[in-house]
A protein has these predicted regions:
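Active-site-adjacent alpha-helix of alpha/beta-hydrolase-fold enzymes
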Residues: 362-390
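Catalytic active-site module of serine/aspartate enzymes centered on a nucleophile-bearing elbow/loop
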Residues: 386-422
């Protein structure tokens, strides 16, 4: 697909309506007659290959060319965490005083099938002067994207990696090692909890193989928003998926925990673009979801399948109600959707590591406008009922302000938690 300017990318959510001669407004899309015209318009634009395999058509475009990401990747005989390949990375914009390695390991997807996952290990060159081995922070960056070029391992080598919230430079300044998993997995399954957990935990396993001096390091996980999905699921899955791994704790903020809540707060509102992207991401792990896509929705999915976060978020300006794009009324209430929602709601089992959860709260100021606080407070209660040690902090601000407001406290919690392991 040709490279588009950001305004052009952001406008693509309404491009089909414009091409059909219909105003691309949320109100217009609720008309059955309008949707029939849009579906007819989109159907004529689908290729034979897209019609033949609708699931394959929404998968991200593979990264082409020889090198680290090249196929074929033979997983025969490998166990989770086995290293497939590793290479040193020299970013286009040099960062003095650090060493960067990206690596690929064997893992499993949501259905238990073998898949490769990738991660990046960033280490200060300065010797660790503290007691014991150098601490490690597993930094689950909010990727919130659908294309493989948005994965941290790919972006960091091109000097375009952006940390949000900006913890990475602060962690490196403390002389910690930082592991950046590509937690959306090989299909960029944005928001799929089990896939994210496996990617994170197998990345940690792989890290201990390529850097054995870190195998006994005190380790914490961290993530915000989309990265918090990976963090809470990795914390929950660790006792039975990777029981040999030890973590001092996990901290997550702005955590989406319940897609029933997100359906009410984001669908048809300013968050509709990212909610739509998360729907596509889930469909990549649950192929049966594609059955719910009308032709117009499916055609849009094929157009945005490689998009990074900014244009996906900007598409929320259209405030499209995804329900009207489905082939059935009230698709969110369908057995397919409800099964996926249930499978991606954490809380069924409790982590064994201490956990800090924080969230923008109306009780402090504003409150998170996209991700309702009640979802995370329910998770706190469920995990505590399961015997977990969970601290909850309500912080001031909406979704973005809360991330920054919590940074000092989160950094202190990380420091204290890592030091308690010595």
């Amino acid at each position: 697909m040709p490279k588009l300017s950001l305004p052009a990318e952001a406008a693509l959510a309404a491009a089909g309506a414009a091409a059909a001669g219909i105003a691309g407004s949320a109100t217009a899309l609720r008309s059955p007659a309008v949707m029939r015209r849009l579906n007819d318009w989109a159907s004529r634009r689908l290729t034979d290959a897209q019609r033949a395999d609708r699931y394959a058509a929404i998968l991200p475009t593979p990264l082409s060319g020889p090198g680290f990401y090249a196929d074929p990747i033979d997983l025969t005989g490998l166990v989770n965490g086995d290293v497939i390949r590793v290479e040193r990375v020299s970013p286009r914009i040099a960062v003095p005083g650090i060493s960067i390695r990206r690596f690929m390991v064997a893992s499993t997807d949501t259905a238990g099938n073998p898949v490769p996952v990738t991660a990046t290990l960033v280490e200060p060159r300065r010797p660790w002067r503290g007691s014991g081995p150098r601490p490690v922070v597993v930094r689950n960056q909010p990727i919130n994207s659908l294309g493989l070029k948005a994965a941290p391992s790919h972006r960091i080598g091109r000097g375009v990696f952006i940390d949000m919230p900006p913890f990475l430079p602060l962690l490196l300044a403390r002389n910690y090692a930082v592991l950046l998993p590509d937690h959306e997995g090989p299909r960029m399954a944005y928001s799929a909890g089990v896939m994210a957990a496996h990617a994170v935990l197998d990345s940690v396993r792989g890290m201990t193989r390529i850097a054995p001096e870190l195998a006994e390091s005190p380790t914490v996980m961290d993530g915000y928003s989309g990265g918090a999905i990976a963090t809470v699921w990795a914390a929950q899955e660790q006792p039975h998926y990777a029981p040999e791994l030890r973590f001092a704790g996990a901290v997550a903020g702005g955590t989406p925990t319940d897609y029933a809540l997100l359906h009410r707060s984001m669908n048809g509102a300013w968050g509709a673009g990212l909610f739509a992207a998360a729907t596509i991401g889930q469909a990549r792990e649950y192929p049966e979801m594609v059955e719910l896509f009308g032709d117009f929705a499916f055609h849009l999915a094929t157009l945005v399948k490689d998009y990074p976060q900014p244009p996906l978020a900007a598409a929320g300006l259209a405030r499209i109600d995804l329900d009207v794009l489905a082939v059935i009324p009230e698709p969110f209430e369908s057995p397919i959707a409800q099964a996926v929602v249930g499978a991606n709601k954490p809380g069924a089992s409790a982590p064994q590591m201490p956990v800090l959860l924080y969230h923008g709260s109306r009780s402090k100021l504003l409150g998170d406008q996209f991700i309702p606080e009640e979802g995370v407070t329910e998770l706190v209660a469920r995990w505590r009922d399961g015997g977990a040690t969970v601290e909850y902090r309500a912080v001031p601000g909406e979704h973005m302000i809360a991330a920054g407001a919590a940074m000092p406290g989160v950094l202190r919690w990380m420091r204290d938690t890592l030091e308690a392991e010595r």
